[in-house]
Amino acid sequence: MAASGNKIIIIAAPSGAGKTSIVKRLLDHMPDQLAFSVSCTTRSPRPGETNGVEYYFTTAEDFEKKIANGELAEWEMVYFGKYYGTPVSELERIWKLGKTPLLDIDVKGGLKVRNRFPDSSLALFIEPPSLEELSRRLHARGTETPESLDARLNKASYEMSFKTEFDRIVLNTDLDQACAETEQLIRNFLQA
């Protein structure tokens, strides 16, 4: 699927580690090189999210058709029976623009993409300073029930065990520093 020279940047992390904040900064700093790869999901939109911008929001039935038709580069059932996936059409759309897809993705999905495109991807794991800080960040969002917060923290602990399978680990204790480190890693990869 990836033609010679087509690269992919994977930013993965437990929920609340700061990957989306880092991705937004990267897109602001590198608009000529990177384009956001819009994933599809069966979860409901959060306040302020727009279909086709943050995600393509779809039904479970439609998502399962995409799986059956081979339309997804990767997919996972992530939280509480909600699907997330990367449409092949998104990667192709971005490559046609002459840019590199930037994936804001969960840990298992990130590893699937990395394993599917081992020679053309850079997989970065954004590590939170601690599970306590991660809990504070998730609670501050105001979108979690006590049950979903516990589930996300348990999943985060599990996901942290996969961090060494990524090309690089970026510790996000300070957002500006983490963004600068991530941007430099990407610039080096794209120039190689």
Predicted feature locations:
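Walker A (P-loop) phosphate-binding loop of P-loop NTPases
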Residues: 16
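ATP-dependent small-molecule kinase phosphotransfer cores
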Residues: 39-101, 108-111
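Post-Walker A alpha-helix
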Residues: 22-24
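Conserved phosphate-donor/acceptor-positioning beta-strand/loop module used by diverse small-molecule
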Residues: 101-106, 117-140
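Post-Walker A helix-loop "phosphate-sensing" segment adjacent to the P-loop in P-loop NTPases
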Residues: 28-36
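Conserved lysine of the Walker
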Residues: 19
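NTP-dependent small-molecule kinase module
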Residues: 2, 136-144, 158-192
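Hydrophobic anchor at the beta1->P-loop junction of P-loop NTPases
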Residues: 11
